[in-house]
Amino acid sequence: MRQAAYHWTDDQLHATLLDYHLLQKAWNMSDSKATIPLKRFLLLERCPTAWKEMDLYVFRDESVVFYVGQSHFAFARVWEHLIGGFHGHSIIGRFVWCNWPKSMKFTIELLSSQSEEFGVVGNELSASECLLIQRWSPCFNISQNNQPILLPDSYLPPNVPFRRRRSLNMLIHEAERAVQAEDAQLWLKNMEV
């Protein structure tokens, strides 16, 4: 076993991990799209400036799209779903919390209807949302979706009782611990190289 050459204070380690975290977020961002794991999204208290123009959002895992939506401020709308799901007012939000902690690995994508990708529909917001729904056939989009993909058996449906009912703050704290552990593991892996 290799012995550490440096002894880090908690503040130094936190600052280094924060720098790494910010770089990692930058890798998943462009002017018209941001992709971020749900557990990291939950730690954002404010919308990054570059994301304020994004008006489409996607809840997904590595192989299935669960939901596509539109809003003039997609970041805030994703938060509304998450908070509403905790209180039973959003089906996609409830699905996230019914599948906690597995859902920490879900991905949130924020997109701009003004990007080249949506030029084929004149960059119109509703038409851009419809294009994404037709492309991916999300599990929970019923409108404009002739054949929604069936929810994979590995996930609980949103109508089951919460298995781990806690306060929203406790769940966010769990996400924070998971991010810290992941960042520390990545940092150590990079130190070995």
Give the label of every model feature segment.
Residues M1-M54, R60-F66, Q70-V193:
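Boundary/linker segments flanking structured domains
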